[in-house]
């Protein structure tokens, strides 16, 4: 207000502005919830996490790791290729690929939620910061705060990976890539009015009739 040349303002005007914006007075103003945070940043908020799949190779049974990124508003997922050694360098490489894939979008990522795994190193954060993406580390023992990514991991396992024996890295990468494509392009999501994540069309308005207009014909 001062920049507009308004030097004095009465208490009632302040009160009216707060009421118009649904802002409670300071003594009763509550802190925002995690759900409030997700909604406020929904268009540009992503989250990531790891999951594993046991595969069969010439060396025997091998656990392979995959990094998944999810856009929390649309539920779109981007998955990495698998690796036996998910070190910090590999995580940075996959993160760079994720940023390159999304940075030209209308709503490019600005915040990335991640867990407390040591593979999310200082170099990982610097890589994102250099691309204009802020990291938000989750509190200790709070997987429920990353529930949407955890739910996708459960979905890909129960609907796809648990039904296959993956013979090697290439086979696993193929399975994950194909399921991610199906998930993004065709699988309905209840939180999106049963539309897949990449379906941006508006929900049609169904025509309704009054009960008195229902006619029974024998």
Put a short name on every predicted segment.
Residues 1-218:
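Charged DNA-binding/catalytic regions of mobile-element recombinases
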């Amino acid at each position: 207000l001062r920049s507009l040349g308004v030097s004095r303002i009465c208490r009632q005007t302040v009160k009216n502005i707060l009421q118009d914006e649904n802002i409670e007075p300071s003594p009763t103003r509550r802190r925002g919830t995690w759900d409030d945070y997700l909604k406020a940043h929904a268009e540009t908020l992503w989250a990531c996490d790891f999951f594993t799949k046991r595969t069969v190779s010439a060396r025997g049974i091998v656990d392979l790791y995959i990094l998944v990124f999810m856009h929390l508003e649309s539920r779109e997922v981007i998955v990495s290729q698998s690796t036996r050694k998910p070190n910090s360098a590999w995580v940075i490489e996959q993160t760079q690929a994720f940023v390159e894939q999304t940075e030209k979008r209308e709503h490019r990522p600005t915040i990335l939620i991640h867990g407390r795994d040591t593979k999310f190193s200082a170099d990982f954060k610097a890589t994102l910061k250099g691309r204009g993406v802020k990291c938000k580390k989750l509190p200790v023992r709070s997987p429920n705060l990353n529930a949407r990514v955890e739910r996708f991991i459960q979905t890909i396992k129960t609907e796809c990976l648990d039904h296959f024996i993956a013979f090697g890295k290439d086979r696993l990468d193929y399975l994950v890539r194909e399921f991610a494509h199906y998930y993004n392009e065709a699988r309905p999501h209840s939180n999106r009015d049963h539309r897949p994540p990449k379906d941006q069309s508006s929900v049609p308005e169904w025509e309704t009739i009054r009960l008195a207009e229902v006619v029974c014909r024998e």
